[in-house]
Design a protein with these regions (language model features):
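Single conserved hydrophobic/aromatic residue that forms the stacking wall/gate
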Residues: 229, 233-240
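Noncatalytic alpha-helical scaffold of FAD-dependent oxidoreductases
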Residues: 1-223, 227-231
């Protein structure tokens, strides 16, 4: 199984799969948590997992991604936030209520500036609507974007957010960050205009530096979408 997973299916053929169907959770609720600092949001992610809480879903977006998604989906995101966590908890109703209280205490201690808890299935779906539309939403504010797929240890999320901001200034290109925060999988979207001389090349170098940073922080070059990035820098990192 390790070989199959590590090679992303390239070193074998699956001829039969046995599935176990899980019962649908009795209750599912989502928290929408805003932060004034991206590093605080990263800290909150690590603190939640360290407390032994495993959310059904935990996504992170930065300020640029928040603005784009809110313009696109009107999901009720806090526009003033520098970072946003969407945290879903499921299970028996009593258990979910208790977990909500624990998670809210953790995120407020980490520096959350706002916390909303879904009060209906419609509101829960609305919380997720913005995140699910983040990629097309970013496509509306930039002619082109380059999406990366690196993964880092969750504890390094605050460091990576600071590194991303520094690289954005260095290359003179905006980046909208969308993360699967629960497993440390990053999807930074580097915004550029291929019709502007040099911007594509800068975006590719920016992307290579992101991947390099992932490796330096103890992560890997790709988390879920296979490695199709073919710059010389990525090839060098892939070879180790």
């Amino acid at each position: 199984m390790g070989v199959m997973t590590g090679s992303e299916g390239l070193l074998g053929v699956v001829s039969e799969v046995t599935l176990r169907i899980l019962q649908k959770p009795a209750t599912a609720r989502a928290l929408l948590v805003g932060f004034e600092d991206t590093g605080d949001a990263g800290t909150a992610v690590g603190d939640i997992i360290a407390a032994g809480i495993i959310p059904a879903g935990m996504e992170m977006m930065d300020g640029l991604a928040i603005q784009a998604a809110e313009d696109f989906a009107n999901a009720g995101y806090p526009r003033e936030a520098a970072a946003l966590l969407i945290i879903e908890l499921d299970g028996p109703e009593v258990e979910v209520d208790a977990l909500i209280g624990r998670v809210e205490a953790i995120v407020r201690k980490a520096g959350a500036s706002s916390v909303r808890v879904s009060q209906s299935e419609e509101e829960r779906n609305l919380f997720w609507a913005g995140r699910k539309s983040a990629f097309p939403a970013v496509g509306r504010i930039s002619p082109d974007y380059l999406c990366m797929d690196g993964t880092i240890p969750r504890r390094r999320l605050p460091d990576m957010m600071r590194r991303m901001a520094s690289l954005s200034q260095q290359y003179g290109l905006r980046v909208a960050n969308v993360f699967h925060a629960g497993d440390g999988n990053l999807h930074p979207l580097i915004l550029f205009d291929a019709n502007q001389p040099g911007e594509l090349e800068r975006a590719e170098e920016f992307g290579a530096d992101i991947l390099r940073s992932c490796v330096e922080m103890g992560g890997v070059l790709t988390g879920e979408h296979c490695l199709l990035y073919t710059s010389d820098a990525a090839d060098e990192m892939r070879r180790g």
